[in-house]
């Protein structure tokens, strides 16, 4: 592994780590009011809760993106209703898992680099 290759991959991991960590800082990551039709019923979406987050490999095996899946938060429901936010803990856990996976991948990259030199 060349120094240039190592620097490129390490930089990519660092950027993804920052992105995933930022997602992990809040359960509702995007606030907006939109009308959504769901089974013939309209409701207002006030934000989105992260369901899962996972790093994505490109065809070269580099991690170049993070897939994040959201579920809508319904404004017509009680915002303190535990049922509505029941997945928030698991969502946060999924983001933390994605972050830790990236940290581990980055550490493996460092270890591989030092084995070469």
Indicate residue ranges for each PLM-predicted region.
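Charge-rich, solvent-exposed alpha-helical interaction surfaces
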Residues: 6-9, 15, 19-22, 64, ...
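Acidic, low-complexity, intrinsically disordered interaction modules
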Residues: 28-103
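Negatively charged, low-complexity tracts enriched in Asp/Glu with abundant Ser/Thr
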Residues: 2-39
